[in-house]
């Protein structure tokens, strides 16, 4: 059996993806040795120990946590929109920092963890493409704070929609993933960008396109956790 299957089946996590998160975070030990490979094969005789010390429902929450520390932002009593919510790492982080309500939007289905799905401060919006966002969908509770973590699409494709439909926002913090902003030929086999100069160029280009939409960049920083394949990612802070 795979290690992630075991961790989930034994009830340590609410989903297999959450099991993978805690394995990657170094919280699972096999016979006293830390194992960070989710596909690690285990035997019936192996001793598995799970040390639960993750603050949020996924590692993504730890990424957004750095924005609170470095950017000096506050979401206390604010209505927020989490674009690309997935299992809810960003949403969980927002709630723990005092958000009044979070709209958790994702193009996928049934990914948000159970505890967030059943939290009355969370509105789950599934099977929804971020490019279709409009202010009418929020009734009278239009978000003033936006956070985003999207994959397989350039964040620059979403920026103009945010600027047009949600231009009352106080700030937007987004994860920028150079591997999804790069030209096809810039990404090496395996989907990893290893060239530091190229990565910086891709980041600057993406931020320039967002600024061209009408946003102002306030700050940027390196994400404290790399992407699933080991890519360096960034957090950027924008206002209008």
Curated annotation (Swiss-Prot):
Enumerate the UniProt keywords alphabetically.
Cytolysis, Hemolysis, RNA-binding, Toxin, Virulence
Lineage top rank: taxon: Bacteria
Q: What inducers act on this gene?
A: By sodium ribonucleate.
* MF (Gene Ontology): methyltransferase activity; RNA binding; toxin activity
Which PROSITE patterns does this one have? S4
S4 RNA-binding domain spans which residues?
1-61
Q: Show the InterPro entries listed in the entry.
A: Hemolysin_A/TlyA, RNA_MeTrfase_FtsJ_dom, S4_RNA-bd, S4_RNA-bd_sf, SAM-dependent_MTases_sf, TlyA
Single GO biological process annotation from the record? killing of cells of another organism
General function of this protein: Bacterial hemolysins are exotoxins that attack blood cell membranes and cause cell rupture by mechanisms not clearly defined.
Q: What family does this belong to? A: Belongs to the TlyA family.
Q: What is this protein called?
A: Hemolysin A
**What organism does the record attribute this protein to?**
Brachyspira hyodysenteriae (Treponema hyodysenteriae)
Q: What gene, per UniProt, encodes this protein?
A: tlyA
């Amino acid at each position: 059996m795979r290690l992630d299957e075991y961790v989930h089946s034994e009830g340590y996590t609410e989903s297999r993806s959450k099991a993978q998160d805690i394995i990657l975070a170094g919280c699972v030990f096999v016979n006293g040795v830390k194992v960070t490979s989710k596909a690690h094969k285990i035997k019936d005789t192996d001793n598995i120990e799970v040390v639960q010390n993750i603050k949020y429902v996924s590692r993504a929450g730890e990424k957004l946590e750095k924005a609170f520390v470095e950017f000096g932002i506050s979401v206390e009593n604010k209505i927020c929109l989490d674009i690309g919510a997935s299992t809810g790492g960003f949403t969980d982080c927002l709630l723990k920092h005092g958000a009044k309500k979070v709209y958790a939007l994702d193009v996928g289905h049934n990914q948000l963890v159970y505890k967030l799905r059943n939290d009355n401060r969370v509105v789950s919006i599934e099977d929804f493409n971020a490019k279709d966002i409009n202010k009418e969908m929020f009734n009278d509770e239009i978000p003033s704070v936006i956070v985003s973590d999207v994959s397989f699409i350039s964040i620059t494709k979403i920026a103009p929609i945010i600027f047009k439909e949600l231009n009352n926002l106080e700030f937007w913090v987004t994860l920028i993933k150079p591997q999804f902003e790069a030209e096809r030929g810039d990404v090496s086999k395996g989907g990893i960008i290893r060239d530091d100069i190229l990565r910086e160029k891709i980041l600057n280009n993406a931020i320039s396109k967002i600024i061209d939409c009408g946003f102002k960049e306030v700050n940027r920083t390196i994400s404290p956790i790399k992407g699933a394949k080991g890519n360096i990612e960034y957090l950027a802070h924008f206002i209008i």
